[in-house]
């Protein structure tokens, strides 16, 4: 720890554009909107930054991660994993096809000798990951509040208390990606193709040039 005030990183990872992949980021957004935290606590939308997250992990004495994790459980199941057990649950999923998985981020931080003393993963079993432009499915959305409660209790046990926020918070992500606006402005199914890039998918009755 660095003195009496540890550096705590609360990190949401995942891709907002792929339905339940956005769970981790939505958790951090809600914490940021609702609460203020003491100095030394940082909230971060980690998105799909991959290896670029290493420096932030290295600086943390305590790391809390929210994410959609394939535990092999029923959709919407919330599972908490701590410390040395965390990396093995983060290994199967890459942040994108071309980026580093979070397991690799943790491994690199450990290799450099700058690794959090405490690590908490609050993960939910996703229901849908293939709906491009989609939002959280109900079983996953229902776990937002319980996930926040777990993180707040974890912090409180360490004497770190969040206080209700008065006024608007500085946004962690572009305003158009905020949950309410993202869902309200989503095109109807008949107006948007959600299963890949239609330019590269063979269309019935259309011959190649």
Swiss-Prot record:
GO terms for biological process: protein processing. GO terms for molecular function: aspartic-type endopeptidase activity; enzyme activator activity; metal ion binding. The keyword Cell membrane does not apply. Ni(2+) binds at residues 21, 67, 98. SUPFAM superfamilies: HybD-like. Gene3D superfamilies: HybD-like (3.40.50.1450). Keywords: Aspartyl protease, Hydrolase, Metal-binding, Nickel, Protease. Pfam families: HycI (PF01750). It comes from the Bacteria. Not known. Could be involved in the processing of hydrogenase. Belongs to the peptidase A31 family. PANTHER family: HYDROGENASE 1 MATURATION PROTEASE (PTHR30302), HYDROGENASE 2 MATURATION PROTEASE (PTHR30302:SF1). This is Hydrogenase expression/formation protein HupM. It comes from Azotobacter chroococcum mcd 1.
